[in-house]
A protein has these predicted regions:
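Short charge-dense sequence patches
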Residues: 1-5, 28, 48-52
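Short, active-site-adjacent cap segments at secondary-structure transitions
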Residues: 72-74
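Acidic, low-complexity terminal tails and accessory targeting/binding regions
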Residues: 1-20, 56, 60-62, 78-133
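Generic beta-sheet signal
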Residues: 62-70
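Short glycine/proline- and acidic residue-enriched helix-loop micro-motifs
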Residues: 16-42
């Protein structure tokens, strides 16, 4: 089943809500997204690029914050653990949960914690209803 992408906020809508933002010139009234949803193979390629970038920067002794949707993060963890998301493996995460993963060296990855959400008030703790992968 082909997933159809939606346009997202357009230039006018973003500027109205966030007038201080500097927007890219190519963002127009059609919105910031103009493609269909990415395929599983496209997602896997994007996840691999991100992981390789993090590994390449592992010894810089810096902190990098990664904000991602649940599907991306599930694929990210599957890739780290050499699991195949297409074969039914998925990590379900709470909305706004935080995880700390340290890339100490290119081939040494330490997971301090995953999917913590206890900092959120109970009324804001909402899990993903289903895993799409």
């Amino acid at each position: 089943t082909k997933k159809i992408g939606k346009s997202g906020l357009n230039r006018k809508q973003i500027h109205h809500s966030f007038p201080e933002y500097v927007l890219p010139e190519d963002l127009d009234e059609k919105g910031w997204w103009n493609k269909d949803a990415e395929s599983l193979s496209e997602l896997s390629e994007r996840v691999s690029r991100v992981i390789n970038t993090l590994k390449d920067r592992a010894e810089e002794n810096i902190r990098i914050g990664l904000v991602a949707h649940g599907g991306f993060f599930s694929s990210f963890l599957c890739t780290l653990f050499n699991l195949k998301p297409a074969e039914g493996t998925a990590f379900q995460t709470y909305n706004c949960s935080i995880s700390q993963i340290t890339f100490e060296k290119r081939e040494k990855i330490v997971i301090q914690y995953l999917n913590q959400y206890d900092y959120l008030p109970k009324n804001l703790r909402v899990s993903r209803p289903k895993c799409d992968i």
